[in-house]
C-alpha cells in the first residue's frame, strides 16, 4: 500500500499532477480542495468567502482533515491538497510539492475558473493570506517551510508532461526500493 501526497499553492499544478499520478499508477485520487469547493458551493459562497469564514471556524478544516486522513489510512491513494502533506505526514510514503511564481499561478487560475486576471489575483492573494494565517494559528504549520517534502518542483518552465515525467520517475525509484 502506498500513500502519495501532492501539495502546493493554488494554481501550482498539484491537482493536474495528482490526477495523472493516480491514473498512471492505478491509485485512488482524493482532493482536499474539492471538498473545500463542495462546502463553498453548498453554502452558496465563493472560495474567498469560505476562506474568510474558515479563518474563524476551525470546524471546516477539521472536517476536511478528518476525511483526508481517513482516505490516507485506506492506502493506495494519491492525495491532493495544500495542507495535506502535514496532515498525513506520519503515514505518507512520498510527499511532493509543485508550485510556480504567483503571476503564473494567477493566469492558470483565471483560465481554469474562467474569470478575469484581476479577480483571480484578488481571490488568490486573499485566499493565500488567510490560509497561511489559519494554518499557523490552528496547526502551528508554516506552509512556506517545505522541508517535509521529498521533492519540490517549480512548474513555471516545465510543461505538464515534463513535470509529470519528473514526478513519475521519482515515484518509480521510490517504489523499487
Curated annotation (Swiss-Prot):
Subcellular location: Cytoplasm
EC number(s) from the headed UniProt entry: 2.7.4.25
UniProt xrefs under Gene3D superfamilies: P-loop containing nucleotide triphosphate hydrolases
Alphabetized UniProt keyword annotations: ATP-binding, Cytoplasm, Kinase, Nucleotide-binding, Transferase
SUPFAM superfamilies, sorted: P-loop containing nucleoside triphosphate hydrolases (SSF52540)
Record bears the keyword Cytoplasm: yes
Enzyme class, first EC level, given as a word: transferase
Main location as per UniProt: cytoplasm
Pfam families noted in UniProt: Cytidylate_kin2
Keyword Transferase: yes
GO molecular function, one term: dCMP kinase activity
Single Gene Ontology BP annotation: pyrimidine nucleotide metabolic process
Protein family (similarity comment): Belongs to the cytidylate kinase family. Type 2 subfamily.
Protein name per the record: Cytidylate kinase
Gene: cmk
Amino acid at each position: 500500500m502506498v500513500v502519495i501526497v501532492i501539495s502546493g499553492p493554488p494554481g501550482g499544478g498539484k491537482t493536474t499532477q495528482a490526477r495523472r499520478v493516480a491514473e498512471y499508477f492505478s491509485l485512488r485520487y482524493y482532493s482536499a480542495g474539492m471538498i473545500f469547493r463542495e462546502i463553498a458551493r453548498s453554502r452558496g459562497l465563493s472560495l474567498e468567502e469560505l476562506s474568510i469564514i474558515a479563518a474563524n471556524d476551525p470546524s471546516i478544516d477539521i472536517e476536511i482533515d478528518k476525511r483526508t486522513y481517513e482516505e490516507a489510512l485506506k492506502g493506495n491513494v494519491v492525495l491532493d491538497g495544500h495542507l495535506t502533506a502535514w496532515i498525513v505526514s506520519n503515514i505518507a510514503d512520498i510527499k511532493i510539492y509543485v508550485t510556480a511564481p504567483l503571476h503564473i499561478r494567477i493566469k492558470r487560475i483565471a483560465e481554469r475558473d474562467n474569470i478575469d486576471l484581476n479577480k483571480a489575483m484578488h481571490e488568490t492573494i486573499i485566499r493565500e493570506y488567510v490560509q497561511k494565517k489559519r494554518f499557523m494559528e490552528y496547526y502551528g504549520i508554516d506552509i512556506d517551510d517545505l522541508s517535509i517534502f521529498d521533492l519540490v518542483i517549480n512548474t513555471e518552465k516545465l510543461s505538464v508532461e515534463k513535470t509529470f515525467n519528473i514526478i513519475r520517475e521519482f515515484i518509480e525509484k521510490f517504489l523499487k526500493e
